[in-house]
Amino acid sequence: TSAPADGNLLPEGAHMAIIGIGLDLIELSRMERSLHRFGEHFLNRIMADDERSAIPGDPASPSARAVSHVAARFAAKEAAVKALGTGFAEGIGPRDVAVRSLPSGKPELVLSGKAREKADALGVKKLHLTLTHTRDNAAAVVILEGYPPHH
């Protein structure tokens, strides 16, 4: 079969397509320096209230576990805006991309504001997120899936 003139290879009722992929890697030492230097001000700028309350221990004197927690979630935010194709621009800020943990512990992305608007405009229906960290780095991969709009 041939592709339709608009280039959309997904006929009606077909499976969703990958709309965007984002990857980000953060050095834990850089995140630790930011947390020590800017503390609560930094956390308030990059995380929603419920994200901050999920940080293990005392954010004022972050443990290695807290640093990796924050770094992985900030990497998720960066990966998400890369997948959207915007970066932190077009009115999208770090608080517009939240990372929540399901009861199973699996992380999920929740978009709001301009990030949600951009995702809707792109036809995003499903967001996939995976986080990982080593002794030195935290990383996140985001895949956006959906039905791209017809042009």
Residue positions per predicted region:
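Core catalytic alpha/beta fold that binds nucleotide/phospho-ligands
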Residues: 9-151
